[in-house]
Amino acid sequence: MLKTRIIPCLDVKDGRVVKGVQFLELRDAGDPVESAKAYDAAGADELCFLDITASHEARGTLLDVVSRTAEACFMPLTVGGGVRTVADVRTLLLAGADKVGINTAAVKNPDFVAEAAEKFGDQCIVVAIDAKRVSGPDEAARWEIFTHGGRNPTGIDAVEFARTVSERGAGELLVTSMDKDGTRSGYDLALTRAIADAVRVPVIASGGVGGLDDLVAGVRDGGASAVLAASIFHFGQHTVGEAKAHMAAAGLAMRLDP
């Protein structure tokens, strides 16, 4: 049985780790390389760096942070933010990323996903989907894709987009609920489940973790293969070890360090 992965997420702005509420109100949470080393030592299964300035301020992804992290850490590293071209993917992989996250560029041109997957292998291409519920309380649930750090609505249905990019070669989908991000009220389980049921690739649940039970629900109810969280780890509410033990006690298959 494949083991569920716990993935701390480091949102990086101006070279520092930050954590905001619904992509705003950024709060400094430390140095990214030091944070990464701490998570590696704590037994995180993977780590995710998202350069949240890159897409809308046209800044290059933090290659120096990536290379220093890759030198210091053994866990797999996913890096996203401002990835627009095959050359961007190559540069990040050469800097030490194991996987590269594509967001806005995949929405603008899903064929870019196919091109990147063909050149580097689908196992290292992660498409990041930022979605917001647009259906009313009495309507069938529907979510829309947003780009540029959650600023730009696209009119694109999130579940259909997930199908499209998975068919084009995305090896994994990072699904973030913009309604839930930073609220600490739990994942949007309906969104996560709708996408997990629609595709054959692993789905990472993201956005809204407030406690350890939310991680369990992301897998058990949301159908996710991995769970991503930030605040509960960054500010010391829980350790990765506590999260793994809690999820294992709930009957989920976890990689437990001796």
Swiss-Prot record:
EC number(s) recorded for this UniProt protein: 4.3.2.10
GO BP: L-histidine biosynthetic process
Gene3D superfamilies in UniProt: Aldolase class I
Localization terms from the record: Cytoplasm
Catalytic activities: 5-[(5-phospho-1-deoxy-D-ribulos-1-ylimino)methylamino]-1-(5-phospho-beta-D-ribosyl)imidazole-4-carboxamide + L-glutamine = D-erythro-1-(imidazol-4-yl)glycerol 3-phosphate + 5-amino-1-(5-phospho-beta-D-ribosyl)imidazole-4-carboxamide + L-glutamate + H(+)
Signal peptide limits: none
One Pfam family hit: His_biosynth
GO CC list: cytoplasm
Metabolic or biological pathway, per its Swiss-Prot or TrEMBL entry: Amino-acid biosynthesis; L-histidine biosynthesis; L-histidine from 5-phospho-alpha-D-ribose 1-diphosphate: step 5/9
Coiled coil: none
First-tier enzyme category under EC: lyase
Assembly and interaction partners: Heterodimer of HisH and HisF.
PANTHER family the record matches: IMIDAZOLE GLYCEROL PHOSPHATE SYNTHASE HISHF, IMIDAZOLE GLYCEROL PHOSPHATE SYNTHASE SUBUNIT HISF/H IGP SYNTHASE SUBUNIT HISF/H
UniProt family annotation: Belongs to the HisA/HisF family.
Stated name of the protein: Imidazole glycerol phosphate synthase subunit HisF
Organism: Methylorubrum extorquens (strain CM4 / NCIMB 13688)
Gene: hisF
